[in-house]
Amino acid sequence: IRHLQQFLMELGKGYAFVARQQRISTETADFFIDLVFYNYILKCFVLIDLKTSKLTHQDIGQMDMYVRLYNDLKKGDDDNPTIGIILC
């Protein structure tokens, strides 16, 4: 995203950029999350999946998997549950 600062401002207060195309690995596969932010007001990670096509049930299932993996592998004990957002 070229205009990252503008994008963050549109999200609202408290967002900090963490990663772009962050890899999450399991024993059998690697997955890549388009954008990862941390909201220090909400105390949680926010995962964003960018889609260029119509939203499908598979997209929703994929985001659910990303959120569960992120909660298991990255979220700290003091963090609130991860939020997943799909932008079409």
Write out the residue ranges for each language-model feature.
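Charged, terminal alpha-helix-loop-beta segments
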Residues: 1-88
